[in-house]
Swiss-Prot record:
Catalysed reactions, as listed in the record: 4-imidazolone-5-propanoate = trans-urocanate + H2O
Originating gene: hutU
Keyword field contains Lipid metabolism: no
HAMAP family, sorted: HutU
Annotated metabolic or biological route of this protein: Amino-acid degradation; L-histidine degradation into L-glutamate; N-formimidoyl-L-glutamate from L-histidine: step 2/3
EC number(s) stated in the UniProt entry for this protein: 4.2.1.49
GO molecular function: urocanate hydratase activity
A single GO cellular-component term on record: cytoplasm
InterPro entries for the chain: Urocanase (IPR055351), Urocanase-like (IPR023637), Urocanase_C (IPR035401), Urocanase_central_sf (IPR038364), Urocanase_CS (IPR023636), Urocanase_N (IPR035400), Urocanase_Rossmann-like (IPR035085), Urocanase_sf (IPR036190)
Primary location class: cytoplasm
Record-given protein name: Urocanate hydratase
Disulfide bonds: none
Co-factor requirement: NAD(+)
Protein's organism: Methylobacterium nodulans (strain LMG 21967 / CNCM I-2342 / ORS 2060)
Length: 554
């Protein structure tokens, strides 16, 4: 099993010419390749897209077999992918998904990192994260708006809606955490982001997600102070260990205005540098002593969470940004680790109740103009959504495309299918140079069960009920999504989440119209259904307004 091959450079084809038999197979082929584009993936030579060890394919042989299968797949065939390996091609029908993916799923009793790593070493499994193994990662842009919405709501709740002159302390500049500095400045706040890898900081500087790197903590704090006094947002990256830097900031009596963290704490072996360790020592011992690495990392996480708790007790808005760091600290004896909330119950759940979540699309042409034309179409179809218009304007101005040009914007039930149909009409008319794919993060209102993140503190106590993402995947399959994925462990690690994804192609056909109308209505509707079933009044009202048939509501 060959995983590391830094000589392999993968980039998706561009333009209107097909390399597969149809756009319904060309699309997953290009998006798989795009996940491993050097401008997109964190460690493309190792097939790692983001999130610690979130991979696009199990190994390079599996990648090559998937590519070959997609190029030869007929319009009535479906490819099955098991944890990054193609395992079967079956006759289905043209409206069925062309690819069905299951990644990292384990029977609950065995759903631990230890058992996963054992299978991973044997070549029997891979970690798909959320959008890595489901082939719809679009770089850090994919989480920028969700992070922006979180920071805006944080400012609204705690600072009268104005983050000017405020600053956010955080850590982690990987594929997900790398969105934080840009999201902060877009929301009007400055940001100090601690990152242990120089390469990650360099990547965020190069792609415009962070403004400047400080030489040391003194300079970092001086830059933050200067920007706050001027009320001009600035993002500052600092190389260092999160536990050490957070503790030193607290020791100095410096008070941030908001505190969070987005290191890859969900994976204590591969995702978090233990305090006092060098990168070289960490990388070597991950192979020779993974249990020792995990133990040291969790001790350091506990130290960092204790500092976050101290800020929380001092009245600083402090939030877990979905990496399960509180759980790791709890397991290390920090009894009150969950005293500060996760970002979903604190700031995002009202959006989920209306089926609003991370709608994203990507231009298979490779031409940025196709994205700009779709941006304009979104504004035209949603003329009264000033907040969304402002987001789209900022995104065009501040977000650099990584790989195939793409866009993210949070829209909900009743709007997603309208946008999908409009994009398909633009492909049909030739206004767009090639088809568009529409997908989303697995972090959405109806597609995930994650008691320490998306479904934390549900109104009815149903945090751990994972029937909902399974139903979401089944419904998207029945509705005709182009590819559907069902994963375990994304975001928060083994044993803590199950989640589903879907992607659908706008190829300009009338058949695509029918599929788009079904999928892009049903997918967000499952989120409204899930939250209505849990008793949220906003979701119940939305379900009734939209005419959803939910028998248990009466």
């Amino acid at each position: 099993m060959t995983r590391l091959d830094n000589a392999r450079i993968v980039r998706a084809p561009r333009g209107p010419a097909l390399t597969a038999k149809s756009w319904l197979t060309e699309a997953p082929l290009r998006m798989l390749m795009n996940n491993l584009d050097p401008d997109v993936a964190e460690r493309p030579g190792d097939l790692v897209v983001y999130g610690g060890i979130g991979r696009a394919a199990r190994d390079w042989a599996s990648f090559d077999r998937i590519v070959a299968a997609l190029k030869d797949l007929d319009e009535d065939q479906t490819l099955l992918v098991q944890s990054g390996k193609p395992v079967g091609i079956f006759r289905t029908h043209p409206d069925a998904p062309r690819v069905l993916i299951a990644n990292s799923n384990l029977v609950p009793h065995w759903a631990t990192w230890a058992h996963f790593h054992e299978l991973d070493r044997k070549g029997l499994m891979m970690y798909g994260q959320m959008t890595a193994g489901s082939w719809i990662y679009i770089g850090s842009q994919g989480i920028v708006q969700g992070t922006y919405e979180t920071f805006v709501e944080m400012g609204r709740q705690h600072y009268g809606g104005d983050l000017a002159g405020r600053w956010i302390l955080t850590a982690g500049l990987g594929g997900m955490g790398g969105a934080q500095p840009l999201a902060a400045t877009m929301a009007g706040a400055s940001c100090l982001a601690v990152e242990c890898r120089a390469s990650s900081i360099e990547f965020r500087l190069r792609t415009g997600y962070v403004d400047v790197q400080a030489r040391d903590l003194d300079e970092a704090l001086a830059l933050i102070d200067e920007s706050c006094r001027a009320r001009v947002p600035r993002s500052v990256a600092l190389i260092g260990n999160a536990a050490e830097v957070f503790a030193e900031i607290q020791r100095r009596g410096v008070r941030p205005d908001c505190v969070t963290d987005q290191t890859s704490a969900h994976d204590p072996v591969n995702g978090y540098l233990p305090r006092g360790w060098s990168i070289a020592e960490w990388e070597a011992r991950r192979e020779s002593d993974p249990d020792g690495v995990a133990a040291a990392a969790k001790r350091s996480m506990a130290e960092q969470v204790r500092v976050m708790l101290a800020f929380h007790r001092a009245g600083v808005p402090t939030v877990d940004y979905g990496n399960n760091i509180r759980q790791m600290a709890l397991e290390e004896g920090v009894a009150d680790a969950f005293a500060f909330p996760g970002f979903v119950p604190a700031y995002i759940r009202p959006l989920f109740c209306r089926g609003v979540g991370p709608f994203r699309w990507c231009a298979l042409s490779g031409d940025p103009e196709d994205i700009y034309r779709t941006d304009a179409k979104v504004k035209q179809l949603l003329p009264d959504n000033a907040h969304l218009h402002r987001w789209l304007d900022m995104a065009r101005d501040k977000i650099r495309f990584q790989g195939l040009p793409a866009r993210i914007c949070w829209v909900g039930l009743g709007d997603r299918h309208r946008l999908g149909l409009a994009f398909n009409a633009m492909v049909r008319s030739g206004e767009l140079k090639a088809p568009i794919v529409i997908g989303r993060d697995h972090l959405d209102s109806g597609s995930v069960a994650s008691p320490n993140r998306e479904t934390e503190a549900m109104r009815d106590g149903s945090d751990a009920v994972s029937d909902w993402p399974l139903l979401n995947a089944l419904l998207n399959t029945a509705s005709g999504a182009t590819w559907v994925s069902l994963h375990h462990g994304g975001g928060v690690g083994m044993g803590f989440s199950q989640h589903a994804g879907m992607v659908i192609v706008c190829d300009g056909s009338e058949a695509a119209d029918r599929r788009l109308e079904r999928v892009l209505w049903n997918d967000p509707a499952t989120g409204v259904m899930r939250h209505a079933d849990a008793g949220y009044p906003e979701a119940i009202a939305c379900a009734r307004e939209q005419g959803l048939v939910l028998p248990s509501l009466g």
